[in-house]
Regions:
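Structural motif
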Residues: 76-78, 131-139, 198, 426-440, ...
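Short amphipathic alpha-helical segments and their helix-coil junctions
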Residues: 65, 72, 129-131, 419-431, ...
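Acidic, carboxylate-rich catalytic segments that either coordinate divalent cations
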Residues: 2, 533-593
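Short, hydrophobic/amphipathic alpha-helical patches that form generic packing surfaces
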Residues: 142-150, 438-450, 478, 555-573
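ATP-dependent adenylate-handling active sites, centered on carboxylate activation for C-N bond formation
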Residues: 94-98, 108-109, 115, 173, ...
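PAPS-dependent sulfotransferase catalytic core
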Residues: 338-339, 500-558
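Cysteine-centered catalytic environments shared across enzyme families
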Residues: 1-298, 309, 585-590
Length: 593
């Protein structure tokens, strides 16, 4: 946790957030006052050649590390030490502040600039007084409800922005200069298709080196092992590097009656030779964790799984377990998920991106789209122009009901997609596949890692995501798409075999880490107390219309309930204990009736 404020010395020093967890450092230059509040988990503060060096790192740093990173940043605008997640350089005399956010993301960089003052913080709560109190930005709500997150630099709070991963910020607040945001993403030269074995060797080398660094911490490490391919590979890498780990998974058997997730995880743990535990939640456990997780993440928590992981971090880890390894980001960096179908249909997509292609092919494909989802997929617009309503980028990862959101809020499509469009316009020269990968990594993947990292941080844990290692991301983002996406999971399955995992694990399908909508979305389901409570903020009939098994409407309900809880705790500052008491009371009343 870190808070840095640069302000004009002539204006006098303003009050700073108060917390017993944070140590305060204050420095005065010729024109500026710099105030830094930092804790001991991620934060670092030092100096080099008269400049203040600060930020957040997932591993300890010494003075030489800081000066080396400052030299890298001066030379290239990048920081080569991949453990540094946020890097800040401040000139104490002029007040100029420069920030780089690691390509891997993970730690948020929130910022606000006012008259003669600039503030960077890892937590929006630290900015509360600087922005005159936290308020929901109503214009951001449509995008939030459809996609479950916001594309940076936008946040759900008015007056607070967020630096995208792999971007740099430069501000000189004492001169009134607006913050300048610049992307450091560069594909460089595309690696031509080579032997898959060469790619596997390089990927294994990077992952093993990343894991070996964890071993240096000499503290207990926990691996979140779902039993799927992504987490099993990380387990195999830990085994190969002799990193002692305990594996852990979550279950929702008490609610769903389905123990498949636990059996999946246990079979992988047995093969890896790990001691494995399953943390099982009840319905009330989940509801309480949902409340706590939104408070800790300081935003809607995107995935239903986030509530499960929050409970696992709080109650399922050993007291000495400081580091937690998570397999998030594998799909997007290895070309899984949507990419194999995009690659296999690339020639059709290229044709449909032209005027004549749309004019000729669309009428032919339309009758088949009602029976075949793959054909419907192709009917999206794939043209270079981002002005079309049915563009593929607007439907990708659109979990909520766009039609409902537009009607309910009385807005056009631009209110939903402007964040995505503004982000994509910065990368106009990029190939369609590369744009898709970067949007997913900088949006959905980054939001997920940021939220899960903050849930771990709230319990004193550092959550590591080896698949988001910048060296690995750089290598795989520049690897040709034919090697990555021609065959689904080709690289991951090959990596699993190289690491000695049996074929049944190397080829097993992904299982959901969450729980089906029938347990929470329908009237009388798990979320009914929250639906009743949210009726004070939203039309009860509208909420009831979303209590259905129709996926997009159920996800819109999930988004509204997240938004309601975020507003209650973060804006109105109602305590989580009071919210939990009301949940218990409403459940008891419902059961009595």
């Amino acid at each position: 946790m870190i808070y840095i404020r640069v302000e004009d010395k002539s204006e006098g020093r303003r009050s700073v957030p108060q917390s017993h967890k944070l140590k305060e450092l204050r420095k005065e230059g010729d024109r500026a006052i710099i105030t830094i509040l930092a804790d001991d988990l991620y934060s670092f503060v030092g100096s080099c050649e008269g400049r203040i060096i600060a930020g957040e790192s997932q591993a300890p740093l010494n003075d030489d590390d800081l000066c080396r990173a400052a030299s890298d940043y001066d030379r290239s605008g990048l920081v080569e030490n991949h453990n540094i997640l946020a890097f800040v350089v401040i000139d104490p005399d002029t007040g100029r502040i420069r920030i780089f956010r690691n390509f891997s993301g993970i730690r948020p960089v929130y910022f606000h600039q006012g008259d003669g003052v600039f503030i960077y913080a890892s937590h929006v709560g630290l900015l509360r007084n600087d922005v005159g109190g936290l308020e929901i930005d109503d214009s951001a709500v449509p995008e939030q409800l459809v996609y479950r997150f916001l594309m940076p630099p936008r946040t759900i709070f008015r007056g607070i922005s967020s630096l995208p991963s792999g971007w740099a910020l430069d501000s000189d607040p004492l001169t009134g200069m607006e913050p300048s945001l610049v992307s450091r993403w560069s594909l460089g030269e595309r690696r031509a298709g080579g032997r898959v074995a060469d790619a596997l060797e390089e990927v294994e080398r990077i992952l093993r080196r990343t894991t070996a660094e964890i071993k240096k911490t000499a503290v207990p490490v926990t691996l979140l092992l779902s039993g799927g391919l992504d987490s099993s590979i990380l387990g195999a890498v830990c085994r190969a590097e002799d990193v002692p780990v305990e594996s852990l998974s979550s279950g929702f058997h008490k609610v769903t009656g389905d123990d498949g997730e636990s059996l999946y995880a246990l079979s992988a743990a047995e093969n890896l030779g790990f001691q494995h535990r399953v943390y099982d939640l009840s319905g009330i456990d989940y509801l309480f964790s949902l409340v706590d997780s939104i408070l800790e993440a300081e935003e809607p928590i995107h995935h239903l799984q986030s509530g499960i992981l929050g409970a696992l971090f709080r109650n399922g880890l050993g007291a000495q377990s400081r580091y937690v390894i998570n397999g998030q980001a594998a799909d997007v960096v290895f070309g899984g998920g949507v990419f194999p179908i995009l690659w296999r249909t690339r020639h059709i997509i290229r044709l449909l991106g032209t005027f004549w292609g749309r004019a000729i092919a669309r009428p032919i494909l339309l009758p088949f789209s009602r029976r075949d989802a793959r054909v419907a997929f192709l009917l999206s617009d794939y043209s270079p122009s981002l002005d079309r309503e049915n563009h593929f980028f607007w439907s990708l990862e659109a979990w909520g009901d766009i039609g409902w959101v537009r009607t309910h809020f009385g807005v056009g499509l631009s209110a939903v997609i402007n964040g995505r469009r503004s982000f994509l316009e910065k990368f106009g020269s990029w190939d369609f596949m590369d744009k898709t990968a970067l949007m997913l990594f900088s949006g959905d993947t980054d939001a997920t890692m940021r939220i899960w990292n903050k849930l771990g941080e709230a319990c004193g844990r550092i959550v590591l995501f080896p698949y988001s290692n910048p060296e690995l991301v750089s290598y795989l983002f520049t690897l040709d798409w034919g090697t990555k996406a021609e065959t689904p999971k080709l690289l991951l399955a090959g990596l699993a075999r190289r690491l000695g995992l049996p074929s049944d694990i190397a080829t097993r399908p992904k299982r959901s880490f969450g729980f089906p909508a029938k347990f929470w979305a329908l009237p009388g389901g798990l979320f009914q107390p929250l639906v009743d409570m949210a009726a004070g903020d939203f039309d009860p009939m509208e909420l009831q219309s979303l209590q259905t098994m129709e996926s997009s409407k159920a996800m819109t309900l999930w988004g509204l309930l997240n938004l309601y809880l975020a507003k209650q705790m973060l804006v109105r500052q109602i305590s989580p204990d009071d919210i939990k008491k009301e949940i218990v009371s409403r459940r008891a009343t419902a059961q009595a009736n």
